[in-house]
């Protein structure tokens, strides 16, 4: 009987971590670490929901997009509000932002909550979401947006105890 040997593992593709773009041999790498899905949310429009349990402090995934100046991001946000009402911008510094409008990354649908279960971290130009606490299967993934272009003019609909009332 012949000896069975495991097949050699294919080499792992190199990942370029510059700016907000991941590349694996010229193709976009999947930035999701946990399974999530986008579906209607009771908070606002579409939301993103956990399809598996996520432990506290674990990286959930990333969003990618076009790097733009913060001034350009505010300009695009105002234009988007007038047309679609949906804005997918993340400030990565006081001068730079990521426009995630045209990405397929599901975490761009993370809604705001005054009692979020995720935190957004920007490291080396990459926008990542990490669990603040254990997250159950089916739970909506939320983040505190912080200061926004709404400047307190948009009603918050998170429904969390102690909700601030506006964004």
Which stretches of residues belong to each language-model region?
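Catalytic cores of histone-lysine modification enzymes
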Residues: 8-11, 16, 23-118
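C-terminal SET catalytic tail plus cysteine-rich post-SET Zn-binding segment of SAM-dependent SET-domain
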Residues: 2-11, 114-167
């Amino acid at each position: 009987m012949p000896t069975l040997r495991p097949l050699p593992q294919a080499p792992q593709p190199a990942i370029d971590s510059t700016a907000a773009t991941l590349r694996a041999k010229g193709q976009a790498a999947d930035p999701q670490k946990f399974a999530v899905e986008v579906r209607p949310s009771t908070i606002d429009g579409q939301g993103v929901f956990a399809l598996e349990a996520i432990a506290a402090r674990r990286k959930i995934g990333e969003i990618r997009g076009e790097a733009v100046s913060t001034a350009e991001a505010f300009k695009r946000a105002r234009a988007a509000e007038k047309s679609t009402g949906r804005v997918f911008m993340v400030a990565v510094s006081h001068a730079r932002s990521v426009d995630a409008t045209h990405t397929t990354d599901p975490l761009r649908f993370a809604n705001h909550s005054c009692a979020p279960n995720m935190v957004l971290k920007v490291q080396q130009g990459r926008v990542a979401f990490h669990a603040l606490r254990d997250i159950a299967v089916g739970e909506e993934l939320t983040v505190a947006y912080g200061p926004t272009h709404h400047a307190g003019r948009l009603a918050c609909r998170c429904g969390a105890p102690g909700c601030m009332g506006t964004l």
